[in-house]
A protein has these predicted regions:
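Solvent-exposed beta-strand/loop surfaces, strongest in extracytoplasmic domains of secreted
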Residues: 1-235
Length: 235
């Protein structure tokens, strides 16, 4: 737009395992591998500025208006990660953490972590955005099995603020939770109740899922069968 007229263009990307993720001639352009830490959840992805125009995707040439291989500068500061839509959250400047939510159903084959690398620009350079996609199989099928133990949840009365959530896996890996239905949200290991709609018909059903994704790599663990617990809120 007009407000960026006269500003230089900059290009951002992401590194995985110390190497830039290759630009590809696809809609998302960057396709990092599903490569997690020992916890099976943390993805190390370091945003960076390109120092020359990349030829892997025609968009670099289009965005920069320069031929591939041409040196290119960038603004001060660092680019950052932002989630577009995903069962994941940004957990630090250089990590995403898989965090299952009701966006993914366990009946599908795969789900995508769509994220972007951004820099807001400065007085010399215009903002830069680069999207990327990690493909996540809904279930990891290699490695040893694991099973979740998640005790049933008791019914509650309206007005309860929160209840603790406790579940474990025989793999020793940490179990996560998400709210599948009902006026609730998960915050860490607690289920927090939101304000009830004034016309709510009691009892109101709540459904919570405990999950453990497993891990890839040298000691692979399969995805656990998710355990769903349902309870009621009474007036």
């Amino acid at each position: 737009g007009a407000r960026f007229r006269g500003l230089k263009r900059q290009l951002v990307g992401v590194m995985q395992g110390g190497e830039p993720v290759k630009q590809q001639n696809t809609h998302m352009q960057l396709h990092p591998a599903l490569r997690t830490e020992e916890d099976g959840l943390t993805l190390n992805l370091k945003p960076f500025f390109y120092d020359k125009v990349d030829g892997g995707s025609p968009r670099h040439k289009m965005w920069s208006r320069q031929e591939p291989g041409t040196p290119i500068g960038h603004a001060s500061g660092e680019p950052y990660l932002e989630i577009i839509a995903a069962p994941a959250v940004v957990s630090s400047d250089t990590t995403l953490t898989i965090s299952w939510n009701r966006m993914a159903t366990w009946e599908e084959k795969e789900v995508f972590i769509d994220f972007c690398i951004k820099h807001d620009g400065d007085s010399e350079y215009r903002p830069a955005v680069q999207q990327a996609r990690i493909t996540l199989p809904i279930r990891l099928t290699e490695g040893k099995e694991q099973h979740i133990n998640f005790a049933p949840l008791a019914d509650v009365k309206k007005g309860v603020k929160s209840i603790p959530l406790a579940a474990s896996s025989d793999s020793g890996l940490k179990v996560g939770f998400y709210a599948e239905s009902g006026p609730v949200r998960v915050e860490g290991d607690r289920l927090v109740f939101e304000k009830m709609p004034p016309k709510a018909k009691y009892p109101v059903e709540v459904s919570v899922v405990a999950w453990q994704y497993g891990r890839t790599g040298e000691n692979p663990v399969k995805t656990a069968e998710p355990v769903r617990r349902t309870f009621l809120i009474y007036e």
